[in-house]
UniProtKB/Swiss-Prot annotation:
InterPro entries: SHLD1 (IPR027821), SHLD1_C (IPR053898). Pfam families: SHLD1_C. GO terms for cellular component: site of double-strand break. Component of the shieldin complex, which plays an important role in repair of DNA double-stranded breaks (DSBs). During G1 and S phase of the cell cycle, the complex functions downstream of TP53BP1 to promote non-homologous end joining (NHEJ) and suppress DNA end resection. Mediates various NHEJ-dependent processes including immunoglobulin class-switch recombination, and fusion of unprotected telomeres. It comes from Bos taurus. The keyword Nuclease does not apply. Residues 1-21, 33-69 are annotated as: Disordered. Component of the shieldin complex, consisting of SHLD1, SHLD2, SHLD3 and MAD2L2/REV7. Within the complex, SHLD2 forms a scaffold which interacts with a SHLD3-MAD2L2 subcomplex via its N-terminus, and with SHLD1 via its C-terminus. Interacts with ASTE1. It is found in: Chromosome. The gene is SHLD1. Its main location: nucleus. This is Shieldin complex subunit 1.
């Protein structure tokens, strides 16, 4: 009987020894667990880095970048013409200036057969002013205005001066008449040129 009683106890102890892990197994389990967690965290971080950002896949943001590039190109086209096309050469610019000077010289001289002393006086006055402006810098616009006025007076006559001259007795100033400021002048003829010629008293002997 004693033998039978001890046998179940020994079996129970053996069963308990088999169910519980040994100290060696527990130590390996504890040491391996942090390394597994580290590998898992590293894998998660790699996945996070490999996921594209929202701005990379957002079609609106790509369109915005394209529009910004197009805007930059357009602005640089205006500020830097050489980006899209070749700038004008100095030879072309000089050729254009010479052509304009030739045009103003040919059509600005009074007609020999006109016999109009007023047209001759106006042409001489304008020619003198043109020669003065040619020797001055930064007066290109004023020079072209006087040259164009000489061409217009030579082709159309000087009736505009006779109309607005207070010294012309056959063109008296009437009340309610149109003033120079309100009148629509010939295209290309500046009102400043009219005022300049009226101040020269060219009409006093006419």
């Amino acid at each position: 009987m004693a033998t039978q009683e001890t046998t179940p106890g020994s079996q129970t102890e053996e069963s308990n020894a088999l169910d519980l892990p040994s100290a060696y197994d527990i130590r390996d389990y504890v040491l391996q667990r942090p390394s597994q967690q580290t590998n898992s965290e590293a894998f998660s971080s790699e996945e996070a880095c490999s996921i594209p950002c929202s701005s990379d896949v957002d079609p609106d943001s790509s369109n915005l970048n394209t529009e910004q590039n197009d805007s930059w190109t357009s602005e640089n086209f205006w500020f830097y013409p050489s980006v899209k096309g070749q700038p004008e050469t100095k030879e072309e610019d000089d050729g254009l200036r010479k052509s304009l000077d030739k045009f103003y010289e040919v059509f600005g001289n009074p007609q020999p057969a006109s016999g109009n002393s007023l047209s001759t006086s106006v042409c001489q006055c304008l020619s003198q002013k043109i020669n003065e402006l040619k020797d001055q810098e930064n007066q290109t616009y004023t020079l072209r205005s006087f040259q164009m006025a000489r061409v217009i007076f030579n082709q159309n006559g000087c009736s505009i001066l006779q109309k607005h001259s207070r010294d012309a007795h056959f063109y008296p100033v009437r009340e309610g008449s149109t003033s120079l400021q309100d009148e629509k002048l010939t295209p290309g003829l500046s009102k400043d040129i009219i005022h300049f010629l009226l101040q020269q008293n060219l009409m006093k002997d006419q």
